[in-house]
């Protein structure tokens, strides 16, 4: 929207007003984890460790590549998108273990 000029004629005719910028809707935040949730999940992962299928995924990634790991993850998780995210997470865990 263009800025009004305060003149009664022309393309931008009309009274000058400051436009209000509304706060973003709270529903836009859905799905984004809060700091507390991130902390609790990392704490649980640290204490409980990996589940058996996650250990198998790591083993498959290290040995036979990611395709088989993705297929196993899809079978366990139900959707290919979640499977890709899980395999990526396991890759990050492997990379972190190499660094330390």
Swiss-Prot record:
UniProt modified residues of type N-acetylthreonine: 2
Q: Name one GO molecular function term.
A: structural constituent of ribosome
Compartments where found: Cytoplasm
From the UniProt record, give one GO term of the biological process aspect: cytoplasmic translation
Keyword set, alphabetical order: Acetylation, Cytoplasm, Ribonucleoprotein, Ribosomal protein
Cross-referenced Gene3D superfamilies, in alphabetical order? 60S ribosomal protein L36
Query: What are the GO cellular component annotations?
Result: cytosol; cytosolic large ribosomal subunit
* Pfam families, per the entry: Ribosomal_L36e
Reproduce the UniProt comment on modification after translation: N-terminally acetylated by acetyltransferase NatA.
Q: Which residues form a coiled coil?
A: none
Task: Write out the function statement from the record.
Answer: Component of the ribosome, a large ribonucleoprotein complex responsible for the synthesis of proteins in the cell. The small ribosomal subunit (SSU) binds messenger RNAs (mRNAs) and translates the encoded message by selecting cognate aminoacyl-transfer RNA (tRNA) molecules. The large subunit (LSU) contains the ribosomal catalytic site termed the peptidyl transferase center (PTC), which catalyzes the formation of peptide bonds, thereby polymerizing the amino acids delivered by tRNAs into a polypeptide chain.
Q: Which family does it belong to?
A: Belongs to the eukaryotic ribosomal protein eL36 family.
Mention any additional remark. Answer: Present with 31600 molecules/cell in log phase SD medium.
- What does the subunit section of this Swiss-Prot or TrEMBL entry state? Component of the large ribosomal subunit (LSU). Mature yeast ribosomes consist of a small (40S) and a large (60S) subunit. The 40S small subunit contains 1 molecule of ribosomal RNA (18S rRNA) and 33 different proteins (encoded by 57 genes). The large 60S subunit contains 3 rRNA molecules (25S, 5.8S and 5S rRNA) and 46 different proteins (encoded by 81 genes).
Designated name of the protein: Large ribosomal subunit protein eL36A
Q: Could you tell me which species this protein originates from?
A: Saccharomyces cerevisiae (strain ATCC 204508 / S288c)
